[in-house]
Amino acid sequence: MAKTPEKVIKIAIGEVGYIEKKSNKDLNYKKKNVGANNYTKYGEYFGINGLQAYWCDMFVDWCFMKAYGRENAKKLLCGDFSAYTPTSAKYYKKKSRWSNIPKKGDQIFFKNEKRINNQGLQ
């Protein structure tokens, strides 16, 4: 299948309702083992589960990886996978692919008063 934005968006929409877990138990179920300890199937996939940080970056990376395969996802994400949103943003800037006008399927970043701190898909 082609590298269309619809593919990654469809995968992300399929994950709506997924709630983070209190431990590594039942990671593939959307609403079992609910807790605020940052355990998710997305973090497990990348081997960085339970970080005391948001998991939005791992989620977007996972969606791209599922949609396009590991190596193609890395290329589309401008370098590599990261659990830290400022690092992911730097990948785009380094490759001169940063834009303030997102298109459908783009990884988008949100900034608080200090730094980029969250992200998602357009």
Model-predicted regions and their roles:
Residues 1-70:
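N-terminal capping segments
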